[in-house]
Regions:
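Glycine/threonine-rich beta-strand-loop-alpha-helix active-site module
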Residues: 90, 155, 528-642
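Gly/Pro-rich interdomain helix-loop hinge
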Residues: 737, 743-827, 870
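Rossmann-like NAD(P) dinucleotide-binding subdomain of oxidoreductase/dehydrogenase enzymes
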Residues: 94-233
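Conserved C-terminal structural/oligomerization subdomain of aldehyde/semialdehyde dehydrogenase
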Residues: 3, 30, 314-315, 319-454
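ALDH superfamily catalytic-core signature
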Residues: 9-11, 203-331, 358
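N-terminal Rossmann-like NAD(P)+-binding subdomain of aldehyde/semialdehyde dehydrogenases
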Residues: 2-104, 132, 272
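ATP/NTP phosphate-donor binding region
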Residues: 455-544, 818-819
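Carboxylate- and glycine-rich phosphate/diphosphate-binding segment that chelates Mg2+/Mn2+
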Residues: 264, 272, 610-722
Length: 878
């Protein structure tokens, strides 16, 4: 016997001493290895198993309840089945590790467990709780029921002595020698966790103690016997369960609800197997005995049917197994509708399955929410009924064709149901757990998460064809490789009327491909336009869609493509923002099932031919919605400089700076990669070198046109994978509210945004695992170096880079401010706050290296309007 347990715990002072000593023992125990713990666990389980018979005898003698032979089984179960379930479970140190994902889970003990033990199962519950506490390196102090204190303490002593002999710290298990409500409440308040098994009052006290508690709820298990049930199996299973230890397991059946079609057969089988059906007089006598003043009569708990008969003043054979009362009411005014914890059973006749479920629901609601329910049924043929039963029962254990006493505690009739003598009842039963309590509930798990970088990607159309004059060669594949027969062309009126589509339609005619053209796409295409185009597509039923034009035509065509292939989609769902394109709530439908999508650009800026994006405007609200999903990627992109030769100067300038902004934002993005960086840098170099010539010489400089077409597509590929930033967010809203062309809007904002991003002490930086610290200025300097822009240091190089961009804008005729483009000051200021909020919420904002505050977006808008820093407070006073 340990030195500490020479202490007799019978008052608060001695309890405090015990708690202190167990805490010290647990502190030492918490340093033990898994190997040491498993040795102790094994020794304790062996000792408990060896003592199963004397402990059972002691429990029955002390409490006057139950059956020795059945308590032997319970003790055996508590030792052997609990040991077997957790013998290989890791409960110490690192219990799980995934080096690839950088996750490690470490188990730590909780501390000291306060274990409240019931009078119904004193020794087996003590064995169970001490064993799972030892397995988890916790100390445990047992508060026994006053009627079962000697046997409970004896069980704890057996486990303690074996554990200490195997190396456990002295005094790792303790107990209250003279239990009282005051001592139990004090123990619960000072322990680290409570394992409460007992009546509703005790469980409620545990949950009110202010400490984490694992308790059970009341059980009032109903068992339905369906018309399809194996009656012999059902009746004998219920008898086996209800008579086990005279019905003292809380999961035991309290009522049986029998379908009327088999009621007679069930009654005959119960009678044949030694059960007694009470007549009316006997029924009334037993009613008065089992429930007194609305509560269970403690004198009947764990008694035999014969002894309960004697208490009730009725005579039944001594061999009677169960007293069965045939009753009709499931209301609590009916004594037989209560939990009885004895071989007394209510029996109801159900007119049909729905009636049976209704009765079971009421019995559970009034006395057993969360605990256990049972059904006997042909599970192979009655799936519908089973599903209905499972849905209706608010219990955490639903047993099928199983004796509920043995089935509910687990690992006897189903080997995936964890063995336990503390059965959680979930929130329905006022519990914190809804499963059978085990070792996992007595450990704290520390999750160690190492920083990991996201898997990145590079996505592009499956076919990208480029070179001046490549269009007719690439289009051959539409017939020879793809086998397409009908092509629907989407373009705008200007391109259609000026013959830009003729080279495509002539080639389609040559290939024998039927075609039609929709040319009502306007700049900033609207939903109305997309719907109109979709009607034409539905009428034509093409197997190929060809978008010819700038971003507007390609964006409109992408939306039409989606509506054609998936008319069921909700546009607002598609436009929903996401933080990570792979984790978005809305999943885009699979595209390309009906039609193959080909994009042919006629301007050098948007890059839409190689991006998964489309911008569409709601004509009713004026709001622009940027859609993004890789399902929107064209299947084929054809970049033929011949299609871009005749761009007017204004379009050349706007689209050229748009492409530059794509490259700059892709390079600065928190999602930039080596794969996108090269494309972005080469695009920038092409634009700085060839945009002025393309602007000045137009169709007379084929090389400049081709290099700009290449730059646009490379920048498109870069931002298709690295995404954009707040410059585009702001430009989208500037275009929507004040109708400034998109490329011009970007041009007016880009250098202010770059200066904003380059701050080394930003208010907030972007969130992405790869983005380690604010280093956007370094990134911009890398661009400057690649472009050959010099400077004495990084700061000077950055400033010179900004100057070079401004000079490039000057060369292509772009004005300095928003105001210069005729936007009325009053109108601008009236819409400013709304633009700011919508820009902040734009899909592009999330990838910006500096996460913008709305006040910062507002300041950038004001600077872009006035061409100088402006105090927002001064604006308010205007």
């Amino acid at each position: 016997m340990s030195k500490e347990k020479s202490l007799v715990v019978d008052n608060i002072q001695s309890l405090e001493e015990l708690i202190s000593s167990v805490k010290e023992a647990q502190r030492i125990f918490s340093t033990y290895s898994q190997e040491q713990v498993d040795k102790i666990f094994t020794a304790a389980a062996l000792a408990a198993n060896k003592a199963r018979i004397p402990l059972a005898k002691m429990a029955v003698k002390e409490t006057g309840m139950g059956i020795v032979e059945d308590k032997v089984i319970k003790n055996h179960y508590a030792a052997e089945y609990i040991y077997n379930a957790y013998r290989d479970t890791k409960t110490c140190g690192v219990i799980e590790e995934d080096k690839a994902y950088g996750i490690k889970k470490i188990a730590e003990p909780i501390g000291v467990v306060a274990a409240v033990i019931p009078t119904t199962n004193p020794t087996s519950t003590a064995i169970f709780k001490t064993l799972i506490s030892l397995k988890t390196r916790n100390g445990i102090i047992i508060s026994p029921h006053p009627r079962a204190k000697e046997s409970t303490i004896a069980a704890a002593k057996v486990v303690l002595e074996a554990a200490v002999a195997a190396g456990a710290p002295d005094g790792i298990i303790g107990w209250v020698d003279v239990p009282s409500l005051e001592l139990t409440n004090t123990l619960m308040k000072e322990a680290d966790i409570i394992l409460a098994t007992g009546g509703p009052g005790m469980v409620k006290a545990a949950y009110s103690s202010g400490k984490p508690a694992l308790g059970v709820g009341a059980g009032n298990t109903p068992a339905i016997i369906d018309s399809t049930a194996d009656v012999i199996l059902a009746v004998n299973s219920i008898i086996h369960s209800k008579t086990f230890d005279n019905g003292m397991i809380c999961a035991s059946e309290q009522s049986v609800i029998v379908d009327s079609s088999v009621y007679k057969q069930v009654k005959e089988e119960f009678t044949k197997r030694g059960c007694h059906f009470l007549n009316k007089t006997e029924l009334d006598k037993v009613r008065k005995t089992i429930i007194i003043n609305g509560s269970l009569n403690a004198k009947i708990v764990g008694q035999s049917a014969y002894n309960i008969g004697k208490l009730s003043g009725i005579e039944v054979p001594e061999t009677t197994k169960i007293l069965i009362g045939e009753v009709t009411s499931v209301d609590l005014s009916e004594e037989f509708a209560h939990e009885k914890l004895s071989p007394v059973l209510a029996m109801y006749k159900a007119k049909d399955f729905d009636d049976a479920i209704s009765k079971a629901e009421r019995l559970i609601a009034d006395g057993g929410f969360g605990h256990t329910s049972s059904i006997y049924i042909n599970s192979a043929t009655e799936n519908y009924k089973l599903a209905k039963f499972e849905e209706a029962m608010k219990t955490c254990r639903i047993l099928i064709n199983t004796p509920s006493s043995q089935g509910g505690i687990g690992d006897l009739y189903n080997f995936k149901l964890a063995p336990s003598l503390t059965l959680g009842c979930g929130s329905w039963g006022g519990n914190s757990v809804s499963e059978n309590v085990g070792v996992k509930h007595l450990i704290n798990i520390k999750t160690v998460a190492e920083r990991r970088e996201n898997m990145l990607w590079f996505r592009a159309p499956e076919k990208v064809y480029f070179k001046k004059g490549c269009l007719p060669v690439a289009l051959n594949e539409v017939k020879t490789v793809l086998g397409k027969k009908k092509a629907f062309i989407v373009t705008d009126q200007f391109l259609y009327k000026n013959g830009y589509t003729k080279c495509v339609t002539d080639k389609l005619d040559e290939l024998g491909i039927t075609h039609t053209t929709f040319f009502n796409v306007a700049p900033d295409p609207t939903l109305e336009c997309a719907i109109e185009g979709t009607k034409a597509i539905n009428s034509f039923e093409p197997d190929c869609i060809i978008a010819i034009g700038g971003g507007s035509a390609m964006d409109a065509a992408k939306i039409m493509w989606v509506m054609y292939e998936h008319p069921e989609v909700d546009f607002m769902d598609m436009a929903m923002r996401f933080m990570d394109i792979r984790k978005r709530i809305y999943t885009f439908p699979k595209m390309g099932e009906k039609a193959y999508f080909i994009a042919i650009p006629t301007s050098s800026g948007t890059g839409s031919e190689v991006t998964p994006f489309a911008v569409i405007t709601d004509e009713k609200t004026g709001i622009k919605y940027p859609l993004a999903d890789y399902e929107l990627l064209p299947k084929m992109a054809i970049i033929d400089a011949d299609m871009c030769m005749d761009q007017p100067k204004g379009l050349t300038a706007a689209s050229g700076i748009d492409a530059l902004t794509h490259a700059l934002e892709a390079y600065a993005s928190i999602m930039a990669t080596d794969y996108t960086d090269g494309l972005a840098l080469k695009a920038m170099k092409n634009i700085f070198e060839y945009l002025p010539a393309a602007y000045e010489n137009g169709p007379h400089d084929a090389k400049a046109r081709e290099q700009m077409a290449t730059a646009s597509t490379m920048a498109g590929m870069a931002f298709a994978n690295a995404f954009l930033g707040v410059c585009h967010s702001m430009a989208h809203k500037l275009g929507a509210y004040h109708h400034i062309p998109h490329g011009i809007a970007n041009a007016l904002l880009i250098t202010d945004v770059m200066r904003f991003n380059a701050a080394e002490v930003p208010a907030k930086m972007g969130t992405f695992s790869q983005y380690a610290y604010p280093h956007c200025k370094e990134r911009y300097v890398e661009c400057a170096n690649f472009l050959g822009i010099a400077g004495k240091n990084d700061d000077e190089k950055f400033e010179n880079f900004l100057k070079a961009i401004e000079e490039l804008k000057d060369k292509v005729g772009i004005k300095k401010t928003i105001k210069d483009y005729g936007v009325d000051e009053k109108d601008f200021l009236a819409t400013l706050d709304e633009m700011v909020e919508n820009a902040f919420d734009d899909q592009c904002t999330g990838a910006n290296p500096r996460y913008p505050l709305m006040s910062e977006i507002k300041a950038m808008y004001l600077k872009a309007y006035y061409g100088k820093e402006v105090n927002p407070e001064d604006i308010k006073t205007k």
